[in-house]
Amino acid sequence: MRRHFFFAGMLAVGIGALGTGVAAGCGDKFVLIGRGVRVSRSQFPSSILIFMNPSSRVPAAEKDFHVEATLKAAGHKAVVVESEAEVQKALASGKYDLVLADVADAPALRKEASASASKPVVLPLLYKPTPEELSTAEKEANCMVRPSTKSRDLLAVVDETMKGRRNGTAAICDTAR
């Protein structure tokens, strides 16, 4: 009889200790901060250099649309650089398949990228372009990335470009075909 009360007492103490501690609510609650985002894994994971020129619109696009996080969630290796010196150093390493940059920086980056060992494709990023900028960009590039609320838009352009590159055909965004 004493043993029965002892085990009952120990059980009550154990439940009381576990029920009032930090672990009391584990797994039974969550906080919904925003809408969930589903990102499919890329069929063509790639190494992407993102040139976040402080004087361009890319930092604003990153803030609003989380470009780097979207790419990483899809299985890409995204690296952010903020200066031209960092871009040159990164391109010299020869590790990148794609360079994502503001539409204004793209022409100069194409020249640098073509001299790189890996010859990455430069994808121009358009964020809140003027009609003139949009028209000029459409003439210069076969494709471009426009941030949208749908992460699949960015990922579709990246995957299509990588598909062409991996198949040995001209990448979809190369200006010289």
Which residues does each PLM region occupy?
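Bacterial N-terminal signal peptides
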Residues: 8-17
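Short N-terminal or domain-adjacent regulatory/targeting segments
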Residues: 21-46
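Conserved acidic segment of CheY-like receiver
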Residues: 47-58
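A short, well-structured beta->alpha microelement
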Residues: 68-94, 101-107
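Conserved phosphotransfer microenvironments
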Residues: 98-118
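Short beta-strand elements of ligand-binding domains
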Residues: 101-102, 120-129
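Output/docking surface of receiver
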Residues: 125-163
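The C-terminal output helix
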Residues: 160-174
